A protein has these predicted regions:
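Predominantly cytoplasmic-facing regulatory/coupling regions of multi-pass membrane proteins
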Residues: 1-88, 145, 151-267, 306-333
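Extended non-transmembrane interhelical loops and adjacent amphipathic helices
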Residues: 72, 85-114
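Alpha-helical transmembrane segments of multi-pass membrane proteins
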Residues: 89-90, 94, 122-134, 226, ...
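Membrane-interface alpha-helices at helix entry/exit sites of multi-pass transporters
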Residues: 80-83, 102, 115-127, 136, ...
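Transmembrane alpha-helix interface/packing and boundary motifs in multi-pass membrane proteins
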Residues: 89-98, 258-279
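Alpha-helical transmembrane segments and their lipid-water interface positions
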Residues: 55, 63, 67, 94-105, ...
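Interfacial segments of multi-pass membrane proteins
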Residues: 109-116, 210, 280-298
Length: 333
């Protein structure tokens, strides 16, 4: 069983890396990488890149502070430093195995501060749900404000927006809902047939309790402030890189917001740090705003690579700090 699980996990990781690699290969198959070296040495303003770093760090710190806030109402007390370092490390490990970071940070709090894993995971689910809703809201607003750009995008990619929307109907939604309910009922029935049912039930209860913690957050406005801080910092971390390159310095905040949102949605595809899907989505939108193909390819490759290196550096820092951190019981692990 363990071998089978290891094989399945290895296949998932391999397929994820292959998918990202294939997209990048297709995008850069005829690309002259000498232009990247020339841009790095002579064609970009590194001052703006360095100025973007504090916002990348601050975004993860805000996430750590917010997580610490959501754990308090459910009786779980984690050290703020552990919460932040767990966030740093979770992003780094997700570069290897996409989406594993959510579980990793819960495991870190369990190991160092004795926090309940299911409850911690519940708060993570709650955070992700809120973040997803916020991104979708911003995406809808951006979509309507920049509708002409998105229409051009669908035309350029050979996709007709009207044909996509016409496929959705009341009957279609009803059938989808019925199928989803049927699957849930079947899953519930099958779980009851196995001994693992009680464990799964307890896990779900813990997750639900974590989700409900949003209702009992002691400082709701602080939670909102942290959430805004997270996404404002992520955006500034990205937006300031526009000023590093002559081809993007003049594009303005509207273009930055559109490409930021499109890139944020693209990373839903499970590849390491969104490599591949993010490059394609952002590069395509930049071209629609008038950026040349070579300049757009340079931009996405350099920005993504540098920001990934920052994630790695923060992960190494967190791992080092945690290596010298004692558990609440006074044991160094």
């Amino acid at each position: 069983m363990e071998i089978k699980k290891l094989i399945n996990n290895s296949l998932k990781v391999s397929l994820s890396i292959m998918l990202g690699g294939l997209i990048l290969y297709w995008m850069y198959r005829d690309f002259d990488f000498k232009t990247v070296a020339d841009t790095l040495m002579h064609g970009m303003n590194w001052t703006w890149m360095l100025l973007s770093f504090p916002f990348g760090i601050l975004a993860q710190m805000f996430r750590g502070w917010r997580w610490h806030l959501t754990l308090e109402p459910i009786g779980e007390k984690a050290r703020t430093s552990t919460s932040i370092n767990s966030i740093f490390l979770s992003y780094a490990v997700s570069l290897i195995v996409p989406r594993i970071g959510e579980f990793a940070r819960c495991g870190i709090l369990r190991r160092y501060d004795g926090v309940s894993f299911p409850k911690a995971l519940g708060t993570v689910v709650m955070e992700r749900a809120i973040d997803s809703a916020l991104v979708m809201l911003i995406a809808l607003i951006t979509f309507f404000l920049q509708l002409h750009v998105f229409n051009t995008f669908f035309t350029e990619t050979g996709t007709n927006l009207e044909s996509i929307l016409s496929k959705f109907s009341a009957a279609g939604y009803a059938v989808t809902a019925v199928c989803a309910i049927a699957v849930l009922i079947l899953a519930w029935y099958l779980l009851r047939r196995f001994a693992i049912y009680n464990k799964v039930r307890d896990m779900i209860r813990g997750i639900w309790q974590g989700i409900m913690s949003i209702r009992t957050v002691k400082h709701p406005w602080l939670f909102v402030a942290f959430t805004i801080g997270i996404w404002a910092s992520y955006f500034l971390h990205y937006y300031l890189t526009f000023f590093c390159f002559e081809a993007t310095a003049h594009l303005g905040m509207a273009c930055a917001l559109v490409t930021f949102i499109v890139g944020s949605i693209a990373v839903i595809v499970p590849t390491p740090n969104g490599a591949g899907p993010w490059h394609f989505a952002v590069k395509t939108m930049l071209i629609l705003y008038g950026v040349g193909d070579v300049d757009a390819l340079n931009f996405v490759l350099i920005v993504h690579s540098v920001q990934t290196l920052l994630v790695v550096a923060l992960g190494v820092y967190a791992w080092t700090v945690l290596s010298f951190t004692r558990t609440k019981g006074g044991v160094m692990v």
